[in-house]
């Protein structure tokens, strides 16, 4: 695979888009004093550098094909004897041969690349797929946006009911008497099935009132004790828009809409000269047995990890820490015999939520070995180190900090990812 470097001293910025793979297996944690992981803002800046690198990669590839053909043409001309020494047929044959070689190289280069999206449940895989539609497939039509309305209503209701049940579990009631009755009403409400289902505006306004109850901040401080989807706070904050009679979700809403991925879905799009087939598979345990069908001839894996999940438990097993589950899954993927020639692009996702949570919920409570306090760079670098420790197969790993719900961030990061995929495609095609 590609060149190697030691991750504990590793990429000076996790999101830096210089395509230097990380393959370290050092057993020592990174030094807390080293700031080697970019912040969310750094992710965007360094990804911009990757854009230049990606363009450079494309230019290099083009020059490689063009130069080899040009050298062949020069050699053919240099060997041509003075006029009249040969018949024109020989020159034409040589020219045709050069043209055929150039055409063959271009056909090799235009190969289809398979990318497999892996990661535990709710790590951001499906959000990445939605971003590819927005960035590379002209986004969503109005009808497509409307198709998410029922999903968003269900997300809002499920989140409100989960919050109320959590309040009762920890023994907290709303301070406002009206909100106490609203909580009962919300908990009893059952939404109709189907994409066209709606929630009465009265229920939505009850949810808004409950969300603004004075007791809610103290409940949210204990969010590691119960399950609440990441987008809950976003939808609660936008409840008035959602409650409108003519509500049409926008792309920001769609990116945060949550549905469980079942089976395998494929998205096709072009990135420059590359034709990409991206496979999104279910992240829940029950879905992982289906992944095997996607493993053959994969160019790259994008493995998504939610940085903010370090204090959260699995949806399907409340006693299992999500970050530990992701580590186990990553270890099984990166050391699998299916991926011996595959590069792994590691998305350390949800950097925005991680930055908000870290000062309130110390990472050391869940990883006693960590010594970096509330420093976002040190914390992200430590988590990266934990993942690279599992890389016994010493595959090339390309880490990036991401915020999957931010289209501008993903656009810039994928400019860098393109270079990685491009180099693998060129290598596999025999051009490199």
Curated annotation (Swiss-Prot):
Region G4 motif, annotated ranges: 345-352
Co-factor requirement: Mg(2+)
Annotated segments matching region G1 motif: 114-127
Gene: GPA1
Residues engaged in binding GTP: 122-127, 230, 255, 261, 283, 349-350, 352, 404
Spans annotated as G3 motif: 276-285
Species annotation: Cryptococcus neoformans var. neoformans serotype D (strain JEC21 / ATCC MYA-565)
Residues anchoring lipid (S-palmitoyl cysteine): 4
Annotated protein name in UniProt: Guanine nucleotide-binding protein subunit alpha
GO molecular function per UniProt: G protein-coupled receptor binding; G-protein beta/gamma-subunit complex binding; GTP binding; GTPase activity; metal ion binding
Region (G5 motif): 402-407
Residues involved in Mg(2+) binding: 126, 261
A single GO BP: adenylate cyclase-activating G protein-coupled receptor signaling pathway
Protein family (similarity comment): Belongs to the G-alpha family.
Compositionally skewed regions (Low complexity) per UniProt: 21-52
Region (Disordered): 1-97
Lipidation sites (N-myristoyl glycine): 2
GO CC, any one term: heterotrimeric G-protein complex
Origin: domain of life: Eukaryota
Residue intervals of the G-alpha domain: 111-432
Job of this protein: Guanine nucleotide-binding proteins (G proteins) are involved as modulators or transducers in various transmembrane signaling systems. Involved in the mating pathway.
Subunit and interaction comment: G proteins are composed of 3 units; alpha, beta and gamma. The alpha chain contains the guanine nucleotide binding site.
Keywords carried by this UniProt record: GTP-binding, Hydrolase, Lipoprotein, Magnesium, Metal-binding, Myristate, Nucleotide-binding, Palmitate, Transducer
InterPro entries for this protein: Fungi_Gprotein_alpha (IPR002975), Gprotein_alpha_su (IPR001019), GproteinA_insert (IPR011025), P-loop_NTPase (IPR027417)
Annotated region described as G2 motif, given as residue ranges: 253-261
């Amino acid at each position: 695979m590609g060149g190697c470097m030691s991750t504990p001293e590793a990429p000076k910025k996790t999101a830096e888009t210089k395509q230097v793979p990380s393959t370290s297996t050092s057993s020592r944690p990174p030094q807390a004093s080293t700031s080697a992981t970019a912040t969310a803002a750094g992710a965007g800046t360094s990804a911009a550098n990757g854009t230049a690198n990606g363009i450079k990669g494309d230019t290099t590839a083009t020059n490689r094909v063009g130069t080899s053909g040009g050298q062949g043409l020069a050699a053919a001309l240099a060997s041509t004897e003075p006029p009249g020494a040969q018949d024109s047929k020989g020159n034409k044959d040589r020219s045709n041969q050069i043209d055929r070689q150039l055409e063959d190289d271009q056909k090799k280069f235009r190969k289809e690349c398979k990318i497999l999206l892996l990661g535990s449940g709710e790590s951001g895989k499906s959000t990445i797929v939605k971003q590819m539609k927005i960035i590379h497939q002209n986004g969503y039509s109005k009808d497509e946006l409307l198709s998410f309305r029922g999903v968003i209503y269900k997300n809002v209701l499920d989140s409100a009911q989960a919050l109320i049940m959590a309040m009762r579990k920890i023994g907290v009631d709303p301070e406002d008497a009206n909100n106490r009755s609203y909580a009962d009403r919300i908990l009893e409400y059952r939404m109709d099935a189907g994409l066209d289902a709606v929630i009465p505006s009265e229920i939505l306004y009850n949810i808004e009132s409950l969300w603004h109850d004075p007791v809610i901040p103290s409940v949210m401080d204990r969010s590691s004790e119960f399950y609440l989807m990441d987008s809950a706070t976003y939808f609660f904050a936008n409840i008035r828009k959602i409650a409108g009679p003519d509500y049409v979700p926008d792309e920001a809403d769609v990116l945060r809409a949550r549905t469980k991925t079942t089976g395998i879905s494929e998205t096709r799009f072009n990135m420059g000269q590359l034709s990409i087939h991206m496979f999104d598979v279910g992240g829940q345990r029950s879905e992982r047995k289906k992944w095997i069908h996607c493993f053959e001839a994969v160019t790259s894996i994008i493995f998504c990890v939610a940085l903010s999940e370090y204090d959260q438990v699995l949806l399907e097993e409340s006693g299992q820490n999500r970050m530990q589950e992701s580590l186990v899954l990553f270890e099984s993927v990166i050391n699998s015999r299916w991926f011996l020639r595959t590069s792994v692009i590691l998305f350390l996702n949800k950097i925005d939520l991680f930055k908000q949570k870290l000062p309130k919920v110390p990472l050391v409570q869940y990883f006693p070995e960590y010594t970096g306090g509330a420093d976002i760079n040190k914390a992200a670098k430590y988590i990266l180190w934990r993942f690279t420790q599992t890389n016994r197969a010493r595959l090339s790993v390309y880490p990036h900090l991401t915020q999957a719900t931010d289209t501008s961030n993903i656009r810039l990061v994928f400019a860098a990812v393109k270079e990685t995929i491009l180099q693998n495609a060129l290598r596999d095609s025999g051009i490199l």
